[in-house]
């Protein structure tokens, strides 16, 4: 958020605000270069990172164990996968670790290599970018504002035709914050399995939901092998620079393909060590959820009484 002095600089340097380049909102260096605003003065609202910042407990532990950088990480990430399994009640043998969820999204798309994919939109632009790199055609099913951006499951399924090979859903969705309940998601996954369609669910924001158990599709990975759930720690755990993500699928053949084509030691030693610390910090988990839930309710109530604004209940 620029100050008044910087706004005056826009006018002096004739910067056309209507012809700005496209870049990720967290790319502060590019924003600094284009708008001539020191990145230290920018308050970034686009990254959706936990306002509490990195866990103090994790900071202390990490500072005391920086020697982990002198060792190669476990190539199989055994301890980390066990920590992930305990964190989200998943079988560690069904878990693949990656250099952020972005690497896993890219790896999944390249290995599934769909000729056509169906996206639930509006949504994270990285999905369509990765699909374009392999020459896949994409169809976007748009959530409707008049329906408060909630999904009409039956209508969505009518678009899951036999020529679609991959369905991508961000749940809860970015940027609408709307979420699909687990029962509805199972209906989608079940019908997709009958039509030989693989489903990727990005749960980057699921820990922010009022009731995680009502939304997460991780339990469904035990029953459906045409499904992969992807998560990361960038948002909830305020660690976007760590680049730690994980995916969960019960498809042994697909897991084998992912491991064969993934670079070894994809996640470095610091990332693997810190990832375990983050997922085991239950105090931080509960403190964050308490803050987000109370602030969401407060801000929703305030915005509801302001002229010109309509907040949408995502859950």
What residues fall within each predicted segment?
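PLP-dependent aminotransferase class I/II
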Residues: 54-55, 76, 226-305, 309-311
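PLP-dependent aminotransferase-like
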Residues: 111-169
């Amino acid at each position: 958020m620029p100050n008044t002095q910087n706004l005056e600089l826009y006018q002096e340097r004739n910067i056309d605000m209507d012809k700005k380049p496209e870049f990720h909102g967290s790319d502060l260096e590019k924003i600094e270069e284009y708008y001539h605003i020191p990145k230290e003065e920018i308050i970034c609202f686009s990254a959706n990172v936990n306002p509490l910042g990195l866990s103090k407990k994790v900071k202390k532990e990490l500072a005391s164990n920086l020697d982990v950088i002198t060792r190669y990480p476990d190539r199989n990430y055994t301890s980390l996968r066990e920590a992930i399994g305990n964190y989200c009640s998943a079988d560690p043998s069904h878990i693949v670790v990656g250099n952020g969820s972005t690497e896993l999204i890219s790896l999944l798309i390249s290995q599934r290599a769909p000729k056509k994919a169906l996206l639930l939109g509006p949504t994270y632009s990285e999905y369509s970018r990765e699909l374009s790199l392999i020459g896949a055609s994409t169809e976007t099913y748009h959530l409707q504002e008049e329906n408060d951006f909630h999904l009409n499951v039956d209508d969505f399924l009518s678009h899951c035709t036999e020529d679609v090979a991959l369905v991508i859903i961000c749940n809860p969705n970015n940027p609408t914050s709307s979420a699909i309940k687990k029962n509805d998601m199972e209906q989608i996954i079940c019908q997709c399995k009958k039509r030989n369609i693989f489903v990727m669910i990005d749960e980057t924001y699921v820990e922010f939901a009022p009731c995680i158990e009502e939304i997460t599709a991780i339990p469904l990975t035990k029953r459906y092998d045409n499904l992969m759930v992807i998560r990361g720690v960038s948002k909830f755990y305020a660690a976007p620079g760590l680049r730690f993500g994980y995916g969960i699928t019960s498809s042994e053949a697909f897991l084998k393909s992912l491991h064969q084509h993934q670079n070894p030691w994809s996640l470095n030693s610091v990332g693997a060590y810190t990832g375990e610390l983050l997922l085991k910090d239950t105090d931080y988990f509960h403190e964050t959820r308490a803050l987000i839930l109370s602030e969401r309710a407060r801000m929703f109530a305030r915005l509801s009484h302001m002229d010109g604004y309509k907040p949408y209940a995502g859950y």
